[in-house]
Amino acid sequence: MEKLSANKIRQLWIDFFRERNHFFIESKPLVPQNDDSLLWINSGVATLKDYFTGKKIPPSKRLVNSQKALRTNDIENVGLTSRHHTLFEMLGNFSIGDYFKTEAIDYAYEFLTKKLKLDPKNLFITYYDGDDITFEKWKSLGFSNEKLIKGSRKTNFWDLGQGPCGPCSEIYFDRGPKFDSRGSELIKNEIENDRFIEIWNIVFSEFNNDGQQNYTPLKSKNIDTGAGFERIVSILQDGPTNYDTDLFLPIIAEIEKNTVFRYKIENYFLKEPRQTQINKSFRIIADHIRAITLAINDGVQPSNLHRGYIIRRLIRRAYWNGKELGISHPFLYKLVEIVGKTLDYRFDIPTISKIILNEEENFAKTLEIGYNLLESQLKINKNQIKPVTVFKLFETYGFPVELTKEILAEKNIDFDLSQLVEFQEKHSQISRAKKTTGMQKVINSLTQIKAKISDFIGYHTHHIETKISFLANKDEEVAETNGENLSYVIFEKTPFYATAGGQKHDQGWIIQNNSTIEILDVFKDKFLNNIHVFKGKIVKNQPVFLKLDTKNRLNLERNHSGTHLLFASLRQEFGSEIKQLGSDNNEDRLTFDFPLNRKPSDQEIKSVENRINSYINQKIKRKYLVTNLEEAQKLNAIMTLEESEYMDPNSLRLVIFDKITTDLCGGTHIENTELLEKFTILSCQSKGSGIYRIRAVTSWNKYFEFLKGKIQEILSKISALKNKIKKIEPNFGLNLPNLVDLEQQFDYLKKIEDDLRIYYKKLLKSQLRIAKSELDANKIIEIGKFSFYLDFNLPLHNLKQIAATWREQNPRISFILGANLVNNEFLIIVSSAILASNQILEKIFEIFTGSGGGNYKIAQGKIQKKPEKEVFIKLLWENITEF
């Protein structure tokens, strides 16, 4: 057995199967594309499902991959056991209707014994009882009955309850009695152990389950294999665990630079309790930073929702384990570069590091206060924890519920998780189900269509006489429509583009027997037929004339091509790793979603816009190229658009704007960039979770419409600013000239707005100077280890700004300020840098009837009357541990 590097082992796998005519599929992103059934790519075959179901045509009947995958369902075992990981790689070789059992077993045996030079004496095989072909094949390779372990339906038959299924055969490697004195009964009895390591599983998909447990042979038999990359590496590098390899040890060495503690491989056998805990923390950090790095690289931003919540949870769990190693400063971001060296993937190291550093800094700000709260509550409640405290730790201090549970488990303390169900649903539940739209129901109901019966000719043809292939009222095929309901038609040939790839469907008309009927919608069925929606009378057995609305098509093409140019410009501005998360192009405007770890500046957005307008001025011709997947990859074609999922890999359509971008796309596009006229970014807004959406238009008409709207917005802002200034300077006046040119008017009014805003801020600052010098030391009250400043006799005007200013100047003091309102009501403002202002306000409302809200730093509300200072002090003493 030769000791090989992880990268060498991966390459040996790929090369071995390429030499045997397998097409290599590169590892896909961890975020599933067009598959709402999965949160993450969690297996090697997950990205290939459409090939096995027939939804997409595979580039070859033989495939090989090395797919990164992510699972967090058993995260509590990560670092504790030898082989549990959040991020892992699966090596896979697949046959779709090509070779079957004999060849699959031959390939596995040859790779393990010839390429990796594993001793066959150390291999044990499981097989399904009754699968004689598999049993005899392994026996012919020299395996004795003692090495061939008979499995049951439970252990050696893959069946999801409906659809393709079949027996499987697993390959185990025996690491010897030093790992466990017991023998092969560990495999037979499914006992968890570190001696017999499952390294390969071959699934023979040869039956179809109709859902009623009736099994029939498949016409096309398939092979689906999975080999555990980290497990194979640990065996070849003789590491006691997966962590003791060149996939993890360089990361662990980098962690050691930040702590006095050391990771000790030999402790696997020594099992010294304190060192076991130390090793566990090192492993958790090393494991999690790999998952964090790859997930962020694939476009996931840490947040409190969906996938972002899981990544934030991993960051905070890793950071907490750093604290267990005595690391009291951000350090995870420093590990990104070494992760890049241990894995064979391209990373945007600076961007990923910044995102992680920001997360660490945010968590560090509240970690100590939150942990102190937890400790104090445990002391007060005699090692019992209230669900409300767990809730507060998450909402206020950013402790994931699961992390709190782990911390408590280490202290042998349990808490009632059932009372947190509503909270967890609100903050971290991930919905995987989407409502089926009415249109999808129509598609599903058109069961009469069994194949592709229509051709799209609309790239170059805008009108045609053709025949009807299919005609239906609702979900019932008819010879003639009644004209009363929405109806559906498929033509032999059609110039009408169906909604796909972010581009809206074409508009136009059906003409038959001097009757003109408007096209209302066009969508695709599962066979990629364009289904046209209309309302009117049509006869199936008579020809029809189809006429495209060319003006509408031009606007669609402008916005679709504009999307491609926008994507190219964004890559120029923010780096080649920028991702497209979604786009929507109709005749009026385009939208484009992309992830970024910060809000793009106005200057950056303007730079993106100017670059696109330079593309327009260059008058670059659009080209189309139809090629195969391999050639498209050589051209560095961008292959992230949705339409690529439905293309034949041997007939891919590329849209090319020379020296700008080459994209895989099935949509329609302008012939020359000059047809875009004028590219204008209307807005760039956050959608949350680090995702931004750009809205833009691509013609002069739409640009002028936009300008008129912006001018009205600016005039409203100028009016509001003028009114605010007049409250401070009653004699202030402003006259605006009437300019005809829209661009001149916009520029002039924008400058007026900016000048007024600056002037208003100057007026406010002059008022706040007084506030900055008036902090009265006699009004500071010490409650426990916290300081409060109480003043209920302040002027109403600018009270919120005064509260914010005092908080910034005195971050260790929490401010509770008040001022009289009309009708004897009283304004309360809470402002604090160290306690939850909004929760202090909630406690005030429990004593004094009122309403309001806010956030951690500042909150305000109204109560019925001016409170007594002594009541406030009593309230603070009684509730200080809750804030």
From Swiss-Prot:
Cofactor(s) the protein needs: Zn(2+)
Localisation per UniProt entry: Cytoplasm
GO biological process: alanyl-tRNA aminoacylation
Family indicated by similarity: Belongs to the class-II aminoacyl-tRNA synthetase family.
Residues making up the signal peptide according to the UniProt record: none
A GO cellular-component term linked to this record: cytosol
Binding positions for Zn(2+) per the UniProt entry: 560, 564, 665, 669
Protein's name according to its UniProt entry: Alanine--tRNA ligase
Reactions listed under catalytic activity: tRNA(Ala) + L-alanine + ATP = L-alanyl-tRNA(Ala) + AMP + diphosphate
Species name: Mesomycoplasma hyopneumoniae (strain J / ATCC 25934 / NCTC 10110)
PROSITE patterns for the chain: AA_TRNA_LIGASE_II_ALA
